[in-house]
Regions:
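Flexible, non-catalytic linker and terminal segments flanking ANL/adenylate-forming cores
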Residues: 6-75, 79, 214-215
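Adenylate-forming
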Residues: 28, 76-80, 108, 112, ...
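Solvent-exposed alpha-helix faces
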Residues: 33, 113-117, 171
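AMP-dependent adenylate-forming
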Residues: 53, 75-103, 215-223, 229-230
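Conserved AMP-binding/adenylate-forming core of the ANL superfamily
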Residues: 72, 90-145, 162, 166, ...
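Glycine-rich phosphate/diphosphate-binding loops that line cofactor/substrate pockets in enzymes
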Residues: 81-83, 119-122, 168-176
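Structural core segment of the AMP-binding/adenylate-forming
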Residues: 145, 149-232
């Protein structure tokens, strides 16, 4: 059963939806390899898998052996290539600052490509770790997608974490770069992120050479010339 074949009218109610869910779940439980092989046809592969499920050494299972895929392409580029570049990809709605923005797939593709280029220019490559320490703004999604685009591994750390907690995560992940914003917003206050970043790097055993920072108008951060760079 292909997933796009499951279409339920709002008028059909929860009973029909529950029945379809149970049918899909039964398929997945009965023949997981066939189920996920069908699901895999709904995304674009750079190189298709030669084996869907390798269960030769349980409990260590391997899925989509030999396959190669780019999550960023499937999330962004494929929609632009299909002629949907003008459609909305992200709706940013901030009650705190009273802003609502609509970002198209074409705009998102441009932002992500430019961010990915900055990562590559600063030596971030396939398999490298990047910590993303940002508020819930579109630039956080851009950073995640840019990492996925080049095969870097991103670790999202809650923006506003204390320096000591961030330092622990720096030592755990040993990232080559931190992507951050100058501040985050909470009801009634602005939380400056850059001092927390600076203190965390000072506390951590693992040192980071690159900090990519998005300056927000409500709190501009001081930059360290030898380490910090702006995210446009």
């Amino acid at each position: 059963m292909r997933h796009e074949q499951i279409c339920v009218s709002k008028n059909e109610g929860n009973v029909v939806m529950t029945g379809l869910f149970n049918e899909v779940k039964k398929h997945a439980d009965t023949d997981p390899a066939e189920f996920w092989a069908a699901a895999a046809q709904d995304v674009s592969w750079i190189k298709p898998a030669t084996i869907i499920l390798d269960d030769a050494k349980p409990p260590f299972y391997r899925w989509f052996v030999g396959g190669e895929i780019n999550g960023c392409y499937n999330a962004v580029d494929c929609h632009v290539e299909a002629g949907h570049g003008d459609r909305t990809a992200i709706i940013y709605d901030s009650a705190i600052i009273g802003v609502k923005e609509y970002i198209s797939y074409a705009e998102l593709q441009d932002w992500v490509a430019r961010c990915a280029d900055v990562l590559l220019q600063n030596g971030i490559t396939y398999g490298d770790r990047v910590i993303i320490y940002m508020p819930m703004i579109p630039q956080a999604l851009v950073a995640m997608l840019a990492c996925a685009r080049i095969g870097a591994v991103h670790s999202v750390v809650f923006g506003g974490f204390a320096a000591a907690e961030l330092a622990k995560r720096i030592d755990d992940a040993t990232p080559k770069m931190i992507i951050t914003a100058s501040c985050g917003l909470e009801p009634g206050r602005v939380v400056a992120y850059k001092p927390l970043i600076d203190d965390a790097i000072e506390l951590s055993a693992h040192k980071i050479d690159n900090v990519l920072l998005y300056q927000r108008e409500m709190c501009k951060a001081a930059m360290i010339d030898s380490r910090d760079m702006g995210l446009g």
